[in-house]
């Protein structure tokens, strides 16, 4: 079910179990990138691992927020993904207005605040840090871009816009950008330099 209101079929070849998206995930079909070999077999690119309904009230940035910021509007349909996306966009917009992250202009237009995504990211980070702190009984040490992080890769947290790695030390932890290369080292010591934030 696609954003144009039609159902599309694509031959993706053989997918391993990890590459099959879960029901409710939002994906895009993508070919090879600029630095990759051209291929006739499209690949799935995960846009969000969170279903639309949960995104409407999520305390953090979502695929819906990106659609709102870029002023994307689905084609109007009565059923299917486009109808669900339209309904979710309206619900998310109302939620953002309630949080004063979208402002109403005098002519009735709804305009996202310039710092909307940053404010959502900060709210998400604070909530995730508090949750992990309670669970691990440890204090969160925020990562600073360009600094070195060492510790044990504990687990990953899936958010609507990606994953965050929990790097644990004795009585502290850091929420760091997640990379697929970390997965084989779960439960093991890791080290790295913090790059740009998500």
Segments (PLM) and residue ranges:
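Extended intrinsically disordered terminal tails
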Residues: 1-198
